[in-house]
Amino acid sequence: MPRSTPLDRVRNIGIIAHIDAGKTTTTERILFYTGRNYKIGEVHEGAATMDWMEQERERGITITAAATTAHWEYAEQRYQINIIDTPGHVDFTAEVERSLRVLDGGVVVFDAVAGVEPQSETVWRQADKYNVPRICFVNKMDRMGANFDRTVQMIVDRLGAKPVPIQLPIGAEDRFQGIIDLMENKAIFYMDDVGKVQEEREIPAELAEKAKAAREYMLEAIAETDDELMMLYLEGEELQVPELRRALRAATIGNKLVPVLCGSALKNKGVQRMLDAVVLLLPSPLEIPVTKAVRPGVDSEAEDAEFIERPADENAPFTGLVFKIMADPFVGKLAYFRVYSGKLETGSYVLNTTKNKRERVGRLLQMHANHREEIKEVYAGDIAAVVGPKDTFTGDTICSPDDPVVLESIKFPEPVISVAIEPKTKADQDKMSIALSRLAEEDPTFRLNTDVETGQTIIRGMGELHLEVIVDRMMREFKVEANVGKPQVAYRESITRSVDIDSKFVRQSGGKGQYGHVKVKFEPSGEGEGYIFVNGIVGGVVPREYVPAVEAGIREAMETGVIAGYPVVDVKATLFDGSYHDVDSSEMAFKIAASMALKDGVRKGGPQILEPIMKIEVIVPEDYMGSVIGDVNSRRGRIEGMEARGNAQVVRGFVPLANMFGYVNDLRSQTQGRATYSMEFHHYEPIPRNLQEELVEKARS
């Protein structure tokens, strides 16, 4: 069966923003207007289609990226829009990361009252990383304090972007009535509650001057990106709408300009125009850079790496990237994937080149949040889910077994917080390990391990809310009862100076002995650089077959730490000398010698403990400003800056995570519940000496 929508009329987009900017409400309206829903689901009533997990409906926030397919008609042509609604809470940043990796365009939703918020900045940087073209939708124009112009200015100041408003609001707050279309130079008034009845009129006289200036700015910004239009503009020619749209589309796809629209999703104003902008301005899979891959076993980072192109063409070999795993209560494990090239039919086989495993494609599903529709095949540019793959996980490449390639995977941040968790009964124990393993399959930023000394299960994640949701799901979905400990900080160990270590492991016990001897130089590799191993052996003083064992011995010893039991990071190890014994040397002996070298190296290399530092933003009424700043300082925080936002103040700064547990309750009581805050991991830095000694002492005892 051929594809129902031509590829040039397919759009893969994400709805992305800060928590509470109105992403899910916007998506709900899109589903309503595209005919996917007959009744609008309201987030504040707990009825949103895209928020289908119980935890999401209770908290009114989006936790997992839900995918759905909708259709939109524009100029008598039918477009297919695959939408991913992503979470805005910083603890679920992995969901945003994996969604952006497979999208072609984004709709960034801003709250017209708050403007650009911290998670908006994080999301914007993530979109920059993947070069995702985007349009902005300034939402909540009906709210008290809504300010379109200020939000546009914040996009310039905070995000360093070049926003171009292509619409202006008519009125604001409870007098928000419609929008001015600057392209068409006309006003659109909304005449009913669901936004379906619209009336086109002349631009109101009181806004004529402002609209003229805004249109002039828009024309100039678009003309600057297109030589042909620039010539016409300078010659004073009237620029035609089709030419302007063509140039704006090219500038948007090339990430030179960001079109800005406005509306109120809750009041059903401006959403249809935003859908028009999605099909008019965001790219189809044919317009994004051609996907590049390497053959299995080739390091894509190497200078001489040879890349293979995978065009968005259904006749090319099949290539896809798995970006999400989900346990579905009805069909079992689901793997969401994006098809970059070729087509895939049910009943065929794919090769998972990341794991080198063949998988049979049993059933293919097109997802609508958590409703599913069986399909027989998927084509280049589609987003779909396959049921029940055994060995396939997030970030894996699946492709045609006859033409294997590996796509760039998805990189996720490391967890910064951990808690111990214990089952309440023996029956819960087995269920708990199954539940946690399943949840770890779904979420790459959630890790679990067993503490070797205490035997406790330790779960690690991106923040308190992240782990709270994981534990909640474990109890509800898998019916496990458990006790959860207090959150712990993910400290790290590192070194401050370079040191040469001579380490020898010799064991003679009659018969074949053990002999491994290495000389390793350890030095700091730089913040965030991780573990770097360099083989500096010349002349075979350590035979080549033992070098991987040395590298592994150091890496494994780094995991358990040295001075206080925290993982060692940011160390460069250079193996420069050593010796071996013809009979007694073995991989194990060299591994043990290397492990001893690392422990010695950390002790002698000026060891220090690093702690995670969080970037925080507190929005606080003027009256409570002093006590909030005093409190941040008392938590070893440092204030970076302050600015007024409406009648509140925004305080920005950095605070160690160790001092932020329970902050939400303290802030509420200090400000009578009138302040809000958000925080995200920013970097690691050395802990003060007195606190380091406390941690070392605690580890010893």
Curated annotation (Swiss-Prot):
PANTHER family tied to this protein: RIBOSOME-RELEASING FACTOR 2, MITOCHONDRIAL (PTHR43261:SF1), TRANSLATION ELONGATION FACTOR G-RELATED (PTHR43261)
Name the record gives this protein: Elongation factor G
Primary localisation category: cytoplasm
Subcellular location, record wording: Cytoplasm
Alphabetical list of InterPro entries matching this protein: EF-G-like_DII, EFG_II, EFG_III, EFG_III/V, EFG_IV, EFG_V, EFG_V-like, G_TR_CS
UniProt-annotated binding residues for GTP: 17-24, 85-89, 139-142
Gene: fusA
Boundaries of every tr-type G domain copy: 8-286
Gene source species: Herpetosiphon aurantiacus (strain ATCC 23779 / DSM 785 / 114-95)
Gene Ontology MF, one: GTP binding
Biological process, per Gene Ontology: ribosome disassembly
Alphabetical keyword list: Cytoplasm, Elongation factor, GTP-binding, Nucleotide-binding, Protein biosynthesis
NCBIfam families, A to Z: EF-G, PRK12740.1-3, PRK12740.1-5, small_GTP
Pfam families according to UniProt: EF-G_D2, EFG_C, EFG_III, EFG_IV, GTP_EFTU
Function description: Catalyzes the GTP-dependent ribosomal translocation step during translation elongation. During this step, the ribosome changes from the pre-translocational (PRE) to the post-translocational (POST) state as the newly formed A-site-bound peptidyl-tRNA and P-site-bound deacylated tRNA move to the P and E sites, respectively. Catalyzes the coordinated movement of the two tRNA molecules, the mRNA and conformational changes in the ribosome.
Keyword GTP-binding in record: yes
